[in-house]
Amino acid sequence: GDTSKVNPLSPVDLVIDHSVTVDHFGDDDAFEENVRLEMERNHERYMFLKWGKQAFSRFSVVPPGTGICHQVNLEYLGKAVWSELQDGEWIAYPDSLVGTDSHTTMINGLGVLGWGVGGIEAEAAMLGQPVSMLIPDVVGFKLTGKLREGITATDLVLTVTQMLRKHGVVGKFVEFYGDGLDSLPLADRATIANMSPEYGATCGFFPIDAITLEYMRLSGRSDDLVELVETYAKAQGMWRNPGDEPVFTSTLELDMGDVEASLAGPKRPQDRVALGDVPKAFAASAELELNTAQRDRQPVDYTMNGQPYQLPDGAVVIAAITSCTNTSNPSVLMAAGLLAKKAVTLGLKRQPWVKASLAPGSKVVSDYLAQAKLTPYLDELGFNLVGYGCTTCIGNSGPLPEPIETAIKKGDLTVGAVLSGNRNFEGRIHPLVKTNWLASPPLVVAYALAGNMNINLATDPLGYDRKGDPVYLKDIWPSAQEIARAVELVSSDMFRKEYAEVFEGTEEWKSIQVESSDTYGWQSDSTYIRLSPFFDEMQAQPAPVKDIHGARILAMLGDSVTTDHISPAGSIKPDSPAGRYLQNHGVERKDFNSYGSRRGNHEVMMRGTFANIRIRNEMLPGVEGGMTRHLPGTEAMSIYDAAMLYQQEKTPLAVIAGKEYGSGSSRDWAAKGPRLLGIRVVIAESFERIHRSNLIGMGILPLEFPQGVTRKTLGLTGEEVIDIADLQNLRPGATIPVTLTRSDGSKETVPCRCRIDTATELTYYQNDGILHYVIRNMLN
């Protein structure tokens, strides 16, 4: 065949940011050591990506150790308006974007319409397929007033997230307007736009205005581009004028003067908690964990570096300044540095059990912290640079020191992580950390000093100065004037310097040699990259869709099941199906790497499907982790093992779930994995947008229970057998009768709604998935 047909039709930038792990921390060598380990562990994957760079046109690679894709996009790649020569004339048109990470929405802060899609949908878009969707409602969010002294952009975004989740914006666009935008810096806008997936919207859009242009100049964009953006936006009616009141489907309003210092946790980004209420929220979550308020967890003795310590219940064991959400924002980074400076000056120290780290989304952050002379103070408190990448925010927090891990297990302690990230789902940050809290960078530093979630930072001392006097948060919190003076040190020269060689990479990256070829040379013994089975039995023409007969329920799940629950990205347990597979193929435990790094190997990923250590399958009450029953038997076994038994029996499978199924990351393996396990249908109360699309893209049918009907109202046990007929005549949005046969032989038919929303999606489903459809189109 003609391999040149398989080439992107639109410009594609691949930014490598998800692989660096915080193995080393707390010293000046941490960055170099983590980069060395990243290159060592991921050498084969990086060879594959480098091969792709030379094999495809319109395809650029930003090497590892450079930054986080959304921050690199905001600071450098995004244009706001594109221009190109067509038929001898220059044409200008709005920038737009889809990305394979849900936080792609960050670019909406720059006035660029963009959102996350699954990898399979992105691959199809690269090859010329349209991104189809129902015309969305547009919710207007009016911002008025200004943030008060001491309140950060992080506090604002956590408040916005809570409000919009409550309002209900899944599948909708959100546009921000109001006089509050007149003084809202672009970095704050980007923080709010970044967390669109957390509030459930397809995007959170900020229109182009003078503040947009100011940021483009600061970040080193050319004068010609800035002039084009202004001229084009004004000519096309895309320019925001003060006082504009667009027409929206619905609206809500926030006076930014009402925003208070906040965290979100312990396991959902929308669960905002006022700073003074954190100890109470932590205690409630710890009691829930115990199922009793009676048990008193005592501190556990441990020794580290020859010193005896006690690890208390509620200890903050991870404090991470991480994630593009906040490290793209100079005001909160400078605030963290200034707070660190005041703390060090007074003699405060990080608690010895806290693993602290600083992982910015771009090298510019290091430049301006150094320019402000704040780096030494962050280093003194253990917030040394550990990498330029996602790290803790995506679960690459690395191991805790061995004495800490042992103490947590010994005392069955409920401990916490505080991070400046965007997600805090169960089991995501670290397997032993049961509560995870989102906070601004200065609060991350403050919690590293306090070291305990039970300490009320609004009223209790963080520690004691050299004289023994108590030091409170208010004593070291920087003023708005101090922060503003520090932010003035950020210059366009910093951006130009760091992005001048953004595609070059380190010497280690440059030294990777690849074969010049249009086709990849698969290695049969590779445990990282294997030829996937998704095209194994594909025919030139799609077969008619088969009805679902005699399907068994593989898992019955509750509300807010995330793609992290379905396909975790973090560490691989040695005694899990994926861990056993790797060991059987000669991989030592120290070389397991993460599920995220093994995504090129379907054997690992299908074994990791539903393998999150915190997932709860209601078919096995009281059991945590990826376990189920192989029906009609009663024995508990891993979901993977049960699925393989069902495949031997040729039994199709179903998943039953509650509200917001598939929220979180745009992780396509959360659809690919279930497909390989034999799942044909997912029936839920509601779906998150990207995951619903991914399921269809892999030929899995998403169905919604009718309003008011749930697995609980139906009294489902998971032992039911499911039949769904007449799938050849499926229509978008149609009502589909689902027949449930209970273990006593009684039957009930439930009219479910087909969540294939568009004719294009139906075509993908009828082709057994989007990739089959694209390949068939190419063959024709």
Model-derived segments and spans:
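Fe-S-dependent hydro-lyases/dehydratases of central metabolism
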Residues: G1-N780
